[in-house]
């Protein structure tokens, strides 16, 4: 059995970590560790007083109710009923509330909506420095401070929007203003679509009514002409009374003269007095056209959403997180203090 050489034993002893010695050294330098740790924690504390603060407010939204849409709902539903009459398949469309909320969500998440919102706020104007590049960079940052998260129906999560500002009241007030701003833009777009659809339906209904009138007038003219021709034949043949047992309504036009001159004259006068005959569908279309000619009554401020979580002033600051920074930098300071203590021990 071989024995380790004395030199090898000495090298092994030098490479072993002296745990007791390490802790004695750290204990001896505890004032350095605690002092530098406290110093870094105090520096972190001071930083939190001067660093820019970030507070965030959150809102959760869902589709509006019928009452919130006001007159827009009834007018849009009126147009839909016209469409269903001509095309029954159009009844499968999403509800008016769903379409209004879809437009609201589109505006809420839109980059242009966020940009236009910040440009008209005092919050942005008060922070402008007059430098185009700096102001553009700040505007871009503010745009990114409005964060929209779409809902997920599979996980029962609703749409939500978060706004970050420098103070808690600003975060709350600006988020409320932004949601209202997006809703107003959505209402404006929906009103424009309503006006366009209303005008298109008016043109269509006018064309349909005119077509029905032309058809009725053509039938009337043909009927008058048939009776006039039959009356001439009856006068030529001196037929003064009915010469057929067939009911008048069942006689073809070529045999109407058999009714006799008096009856034909009476039928002609009655037809001329009554004028063209229109069916019920024509009068319904005329009533619809009269309503369409009045035009839509637009409400520029109807609400296209409802809150499931109304924005409130946040109670906790997002950044800087004072306790976290003090603990983190206190630990960093303690590690640096431990390094200083070990270095001083070796030099001694």
UniProtKB/Swiss-Prot annotation:
Question: A Gene Ontology MF term for this entry?
Answer: protein tyrosine kinase activity
Gene Ontology biological-process annotations: enterobacterial common antigen biosynthetic process
Which InterPro entries does the protein's record reference? Bact_polysacc_biosynth/exp (IPR050445), LPS_length_determ_N_term (IPR003856), WzzE (IPR032895)
Q: In which pathway does it act?
A: Bacterial outer membrane biogenesis; enterobacterial common antigen biosynthesis
Q: Which Gene3D superfamilies does its entry note?
A: FepE-like
Q: Identify the GO cellular component terms for this protein.
A: plasma membrane
The signal peptide annotation in the UniProt record is: none
**TM spans, by residue?**
31-51, 323-343
- Keyword Cell membrane attributed: yes
Q: How does it sit in the membrane?
A: Multi-pass membrane protein
**UniProt keywords, alphabetically:** Cell inner membrane, Cell membrane, Membrane, Transmembrane, Transmembrane helix
Superkingdom, according to UniProt? Bacteria
Q: Where in the cell is it found?
A: Cell inner membrane
The entry assigns this protein to a family as follows: Belongs to the WzzB/Cld/Rol family.
Q: Which PANTHER family match?
A: ECA POLYSACCHARIDE CHAIN LENGTH MODULATION PROTEIN, TYROSINE-PROTEIN KINASE
State its role. Modulates the polysaccharide chain length of enterobacterial common antigen (ECA).
**Could you describe the subunit structure of this protein?**
Probably part of a complex composed of WzxE, WzyE and WzzE.
Q: What is this protein called?
A: ECA polysaccharide chain length modulation protein
Organism (species): Salmonella typhimurium (strain LT2 / SGSC1412 / ATCC 700720)
Lineage, highest ranks first: Bacteria, Pseudomonadati, Pseudomonadota, Gammaproteobacteria, Enterobacterales
């Amino acid at each position: 059995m071989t024995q380790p050489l004395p030199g090898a034993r000495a090298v092994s002893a030098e490479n072993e970590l002296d745990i007791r010695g390490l802790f004695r050294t750290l204990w001896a330098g505890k004032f350095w560790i605690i002092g530098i740790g406290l110093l870094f924690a105090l520096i972190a504390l001071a930083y939190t007083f001067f660093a820019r603060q970030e507070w965030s407010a959150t809102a959760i939204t869902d589709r509006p109710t019928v009452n919130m849409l006001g007159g827009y709902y009834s007018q849009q539903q009126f147009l839909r009923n016209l469409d269903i009459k001509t095309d029954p398949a159009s009844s499968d469309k999403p509800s008016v509330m769903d379409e209004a909320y879809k437009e609201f969500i589109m505006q809420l998440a839109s980059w242009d909506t966020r940009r236009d919102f910040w440009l008209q706020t005092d919050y942005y104007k008060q922070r402008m420095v007059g430098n185009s590049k700096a102001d553009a960079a700040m505007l871009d940052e503010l745009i990114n401070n409005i964060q929209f998260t779409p809902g997920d129906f599979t996980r029962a999560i609703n749409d939500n929007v978060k706004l970050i500002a420098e103070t808690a009241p600003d975060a709350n007030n600006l988020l409320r203003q932004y949601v209202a701003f997006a809703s107003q833009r959505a209402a404006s777009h929906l009103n424009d679509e309503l006006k366009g659809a209303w005008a298109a339906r008016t043109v269509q209904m006018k064309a349909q009514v005119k077509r029905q009138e032309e058809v009725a007038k053509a039938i009337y003219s043909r009927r008058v002409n048939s009776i006039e021709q039959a009356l001439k034949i009856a006068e030529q043949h001196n037929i003064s009374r009915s010469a057929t047992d067939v009911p008048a309504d069942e006689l073809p036009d070529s045999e109407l003269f058999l009714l006799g001159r008096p009856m034909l004259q009476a039928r002609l006068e009655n037809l001329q007095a009554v004028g063209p005959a229109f069916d019920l569908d024509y009068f319904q279309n005329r009533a619809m056209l009269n309503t369409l000619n009045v035009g839509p009554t637009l409400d520029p401020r109807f609400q296209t959403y409802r809150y499931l979580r109304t924005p409130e002033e946040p109670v906790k600051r997002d950044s800087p997180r004072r306790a976290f920074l003090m603990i983190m930098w206190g630990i960093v300071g303690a590690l640096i203090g431990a390094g200083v203590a070990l270095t001083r021990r070796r030099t001694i």
